[in-house]
């Protein structure tokens, strides 16, 4: 995001409420296998992309930059996986025998908890962890502000104590 775009957003957001504004971006990291951590997904590998998130466009676009997408299975946000979904995935694996499954971390957590996931899916499943990065040094401002806010207070549930008051007692 350009500095000009950041200034425009700040101007608009400050009309709503006085608050600090920090700009971040989401950065994908290396794909991970939830069942076999030693396995790796290599750039250019064939993948079947599956997601059950609200707006999968950015996820799919990012995957296409790194891997060869041979099929997509896009589901609704908060999708509850069924045996029919797992059977559909198995059919896609039969059609694309070299493909791996690449999904979001959110969907991988759901599938990892299920006892019904067939071995072929476990063997080929990877997820794409995401990392949040601050844009243009705003992390220093964020962490500096957070440190300043925390330096004067200790929070214990609903009880807030000022450190200076405790020191003087």
PLM-predicted stretches and their roles:
Residues 1-169:
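ATP-dependent carboxylate-amine ligase
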């Amino acid at each position: 995001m350009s500095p000009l775009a950041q200034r425009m957003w700040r101007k608009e957001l400050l009309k709503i409420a006085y608050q600090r504004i920090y700009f971040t971006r989401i950065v994908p990291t290396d794909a991970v296998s939830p069942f076999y951590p030693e396995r790796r997904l290599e750039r250019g590998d064939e993948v079947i992309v599956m997601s059950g998130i609200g707006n999968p466009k950015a996820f799919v676009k990012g995957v296409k930059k790194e891997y060869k997408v041979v099929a997509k299975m896009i589901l609704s946000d908060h999708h509850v996986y069924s045996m029919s979904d797992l059977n559909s995935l198995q059919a896609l694996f039969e059609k694309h025998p070299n493909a791996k499954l690449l999904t979001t971390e959110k969907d991988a957590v759901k599938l990892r908890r299920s006892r019904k996931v067939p071995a072929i899916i476990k063997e080929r499943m990877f997820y794409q962890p995401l990392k949040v990065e601050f844009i243009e040094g705003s992390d220093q401002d964020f962490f500096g502000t957070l440190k300043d806010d925390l330096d004067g207070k200790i929070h214990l549930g609903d009880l807030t104590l000022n450190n200076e008051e405790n020191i003087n007692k």
